[in-house]
Amino acid sequence: MQRRRRAPPASQPAQDSGHSEEVEVQFSAGRLGSAAPAGPPVRGTAEDEERLEREHFWKVINAFRYYGTSMHERVNRTERQFRSLPDNQQKLLPQFPLHLDKIRKCVDHNQEILLTIVNDCIHMFENKEYGEDANGKIMPASTFDMDKLKSTLKQFVRDWSGTGKAERDACYKPIIKEIIKNFPKERWDPSKVNILVPGAGLGRLAWEIAMLGYACQGNEWSFFMLFSSNFVLNRCSEVDKYKLYPWIHQFSNNRRSADQIRPIFFPDVDPHSLPPGSNFSMTAGDFQEIYSECNTWDCIATCFFIDTAHNVIDYIDTIWRILKPGGIWINLGPLLYHFENLANELSIELSYEDIKNVVLQYGFQLEVEKESVLSTYTVNDLSMMKYYYECVLFVVRKPQ
């Protein structure tokens, strides 16, 4: 039985407990809002917001539970279309129905893992409960939620599988290198260096930072990510114990049929192997609302994050306020704005040149800038189609 400790306040770095025994990574909830398919949390009375957040919590759990039904419908549709072909054409592909049966088995396995994840998340927040499911039965989930869930399965590849190592090396290593350079152990006590990772996803970057002894807190807004990161960080200790089939949803651009049904194994490391006395926690909620206390953080590390903003200047403003004087902001990522072209959504799409100008006008001092850091994001390494990003890496400092 792991010893539980109290999570830090959502707006402050955790304080070192001094205990050396293994502890759970604590998840504390700020305000997550209703999380409509696109857009910021809905504003209203406190009671309305609590109700909407509770409904969204159970809506995401329902999506995890509905996955198998949705995917079996997809496979059945493919089989019906195949059966509509002339007999002579079907006879050319005797292995095709067998391949679909293999996909069905992969779907069933994924569903088992997803049920395990959500069965463990009902009481995952140390400071919040969401009551009972009002529906009490599995309901059809939206296409939006199913797409989110499929994307979350690919996050396991990126963050916690051996398959994702090359992608992590491209995205996370440059950030970690800058942290080590700016806070060397010869001059800093790492446990006193407070580092925040907004948009933490499944938590691997924040975990790697905590592995180096720094006090690190990850922040994430998506319940899809939070449920999954809680499972990996707190319920997985045996290396490569679990497997998933993240590519079965991809029916195009497969060189071989076997590529579609190949598994990945996770976690590739023991998430419980943090050094004794490690100071690592996760918070759930809107980055801009949770983190309001000025001059709190020594370092803020953002990876594939700033383009998730409705207005990236709001992110810059928050980072400026919560960084300590002398603190640094490390950013790596592209500018694929998440709310671009969505109806009824504010979306300010700035070029990197504009963002840089705003950052400098706030008073940040530019120390590192690399404009062509090549990276992928949840890439299927055997796919016939891959997207590559030429990311920007910059390090800026808030003056003393």
Swiss-Prot record:
Quote the tissue specificity entry: Expressed at higher level in skeletal muscle compared to other tissues.
Gene Ontology MF term list: carnosine N-methyltransferase activity; protein homodimerization activity; S-adenosylmethionine-dependent methyltransferase activity
The protein's Enzyme Commission number: 2.1.1.22
Q: Alphabetically, which GO biological process terms does the record hold? A: carnosine metabolic process; methylation
Keywords in alphabetical order? Cytoplasm, Methyltransferase, Nucleus, S-adenosyl-L-methionine, Transferase
Which residues make up the binding site for S-adenosyl-L-methionine?
155, 158, 199, 220, 286-287, 303, 315
Domain of life here? Answer: Eukaryota
Q: What class of enzyme is it?
A: transferase
- Give the catalytic activity: carnosine + S-adenosyl-L-methionine = anserine + S-adenosyl-L-homocysteine + H(+)
Record field: temperature dependence = Optimum temperature is 50 degrees Celsius.
- Subcellular location per the Swiss-Prot or TrEMBL entry: Cytoplasm, Cytosol; Nucleus
Q: Where is the signal peptide?
A: none
Q: What GO CC annotations are associated with the protein?
A: cytosol; nucleus
Record note on pH = Optimum pH is 7.0-7.5.
Gene3D superfamilies xref list: Vaccinia Virus protein VP39 (3.40.50.150)
Q: How does the record comment on the protein's domains?
A: The Gly-Xaa-Gly-Xaa-Gly (GXGXG) motif binds the adenosyl part of S-adenosyl-L-methionine. The carnosine-binding region forms hydrophobic and hydrogen bonds with carnosine, defining a flipping orientation of the imidazole ring so that N1 is present next to S-adenosyl-L-methionine for methylation.
Annotated function: N-methyltransferase that catalyzes the formation of anserine (beta-alanyl-N(Pi)-methyl-L-histidine) from carnosine. Anserine, a methylated derivative of carnosine (beta-alanyl-L-histidine), is an abundant constituent of vertebrate skeletal muscles. Also methylates other L-histidine-containing di- and tripeptides such as Gly-Gly-His, Gly-His and homocarnosine (GABA-His).
State the protein's name.
Answer: Carnosine N-methyltransferase
